[in-house]
Regions:
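Conserved phosphate-binding loops in nucleotide/dinucleotide-binding enzymes
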Residues: 62-63, 99, 103, 182-187, ...
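Short acidic, glycine/serine/threonine-rich loops at helix termini
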Residues: 52-56, 106-112, 207-213
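Short connector loops/turns at beta-strand edges and beta->alpha or beta->beta junctions
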Residues: 46-49, 152-155, 203
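A charged helix-plus-loop insertion that forms the helical arch/lid used to bind
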Residues: 54-70
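N-terminal catalytic cores of NTP/NDP-binding nucleotidyl/phosphoryl-transfer enzymes
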Residues: 2-54, 167-174
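Structural motif
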Residues: 7-8, 41, 95, 165-166, ...
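Divalent-metal (Mg2+/Mn2+/Ca2+)-assisted nucleotide/phosphate chemistry catalytic cores
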Residues: 65-66, 72, 82-197
Length: 224
């Protein structure tokens, strides 16, 4: 259990210039988290969006240009400001960070040696998003296969920089969240790391509501 105030985060990809109603529950979790005196961290996936999360996807995501991703990030910030307080005068002001800031500067050899060595390919193949692609014999790129490692590294970086001890996310992110918890425990030898997932808001046919899927209900009025 948490005995002191801490920080927790949720990651959002930048595949669109707005969020949809499927992101409403995660946003409300961060809002309540802040209302109890903790510090919410919004992680923009400026780096990982260049790769694409395979979770809940039947096919490889379309790769966006860096220019489009940067444009989306600016507009997404306005959505977050409707739910969270970024007032720097408050002790637990929300933080907005971008994983491009650390992922873009990684040295491949050092990363494979220091971080990649902590991951088991056997375990990665058991992740539901990976397992389903392979079962259906659908294409899974090397980029997507490594997504869970990068998300785990995000958690590790936030733990180091902001003492972030909790990652929130949708139920489809459980495997990725656990990967981050395991990485931190292996490197920092601590047990005070947590993951919390929430149910997904789905479409009428039971599919995950996503920004790139048909029928998305947007949180920005200019997208409605």
């Amino acid at each position: 259990t948490l005995s002191t105030k801490t920080s927790g985060y949720i990651g959002f990809d930048c595949t669109s210039d707005s969020l949809h109603v499927g992101s409403l529950l995660p946003l409300m979790i961060l809002k309540h988290f802040q209302s109890f005196g903790h510090t919410p961290i919004v992680l923009l996936g400026g780096g990982t969006t260049l790769i694409g999360d395979p979770s809940g996807k039947d096919e490889t995501r379309k790769i966006l240009s860096a220019e489009k991703i940067n444009s989306n990030k600016k507009k997404l910030k306005k959505v977050f400001e409707k739910f969270l307080s970024f007032d720097s005068s408050k002790e637990n002001a929300a933080l907005l960070v971008d994983n491009y800031d650390w992922l873009s500067n990684l040295n491949l050899i050092n990363f494979l040696r220091d971080i990649g060595s902590k991951f088991s390919v056997n375990k990665m193949l058991s992740l539901e998003s990976i397992k389903q692609r392979l079962k259906r014999e659908q294409n899974l790129s090397f980029l997507e296969f490594n997504y869970s490692i990068l998300q785990a590294f995000d958690f590790f970086e936030l733990f180091k920089k902001y003492n972030c001890k909790i990652q929130f996310g949708g139920s489809d992110q459980w495997g990725n969240i656990v990967s981050g918890i395991d990485l931190i425990k292996k490197i920092k030898n601590t047990e005070q790391i947590f993951g919390l997932t929430s149910p997904l808001i789905t479409t009428s046919n039971g599919k995950k509501m996503g920004k790139t899927a048909d029928g998305a209900i947007w949180l920005s009025k200019d997208k409605c």
